[in-house]
């Protein structure tokens, strides 16, 4: 698999897959996870925080609409490097855009979201660039590598994406927490954390600019606008004419409802004071417990879920995975009622919940692949991922207001009731019993 390294020749994928997929994850987690923690620590009310940060999912929902442009204009390498440069610029501007509300305003929990207007604009810009980078990176992966290399490196790319998750949700949050504990200045902590992010991302961008290989197959696709538009429209029409489309849409939109509500309120719950109904953990502790231990458990759950599905197939795995995804949400009911401050107990409960989520999410991913089978497999899978993003965006947008109206205990009980939706849509599915099983030769 080793190949000669040259300026215009093929390079070993080991030179670029780690950085490209690490860079794919960082902006996603900064936009969708760090933003939640930062706004919470800055005293933005949960309702406004959850609404605005959920809307940041929009580019990942809409990306199938402009994905053909990445094929038609310029090479995939050009798109990857350009989007990385754009995101580097956005991270640098974020360093200077973060407002500095007074400690009294932060403590009140009523910091106006209007203070963060420019910050949100930069997050939106980063989100669109990140979604476009996803399209280009996956396209580059498929164009440059042969099928054997694609199979070999699929685990490598997933590993570095998960490492970026630990870095984004764990390491960066711990850095912010340590700076906060040493200086007592929350805005300064997040400003310096964004500076660290900008420097690291700039280095990755420079590396990929020079080390990402040029490849003869990585060229703009030449096709007439009319034929491209026709194929694009045909892909959408055939998707919505698939047998079982209503059950599939219900599943894609409702299967993750408990997790979609829960996700936006986990960090606020862990960070909020006891008077506000939270556990009052420090920022650094949340970065360690949720961003590192939790993400590791999530990854292990996904790996074991893949092994289980390959042995039993999707049909037999579906109900156990649905149960694993939904029922561990009870961990937050327990924590909110007991108000435990035992870090070991909190870590174990979060690890169980995240393991269940990783295990249960496997069924969701496999079903999207199953439903996408056919002539327009790639386009149909992209549409499925858009519905996946929508399934997280809409419930998340209202989660904060729901929590403010009900309090954390009642909110987590509502999340448990929503597990009925997960079970209900799972009942609707009809799946080939052999799909997902590894064929023994």
PLM ranges: what are they?
Residues 46-47, 147-156, 283-284, 374-384:
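Loop-to-transmembrane helix entry/capping segments in MFS-fold secondary transporters
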Residues 62-75, 300-319, 403-404:
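Helix-to-loop junctions at the C-terminal end of transmembrane segments
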Residues 371, 375-403:
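A late C-terminal transmembrane helix in Major Facilitator Superfamily
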Residues 3-60, 247-251, 255-275:
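Helix-loop boundary and gating motifs at the non-cytosolic
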Residues 1-10, 44, 98, 104-120, ...:
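Intracellular loop-helix junctions on the cytosolic face of multi-pass helical membrane proteins
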Residues 132-145, 359-373:
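Intracellular juxtamembrane helix-capping segments at the cytosolic ends
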Residues 315-364:
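C-terminal transmembrane helical hairpin of 12-TM major facilitator-type secondary transporters
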Residues 85-112, 323-341:
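C-terminal ends and interior cores of transmembrane alpha-helices
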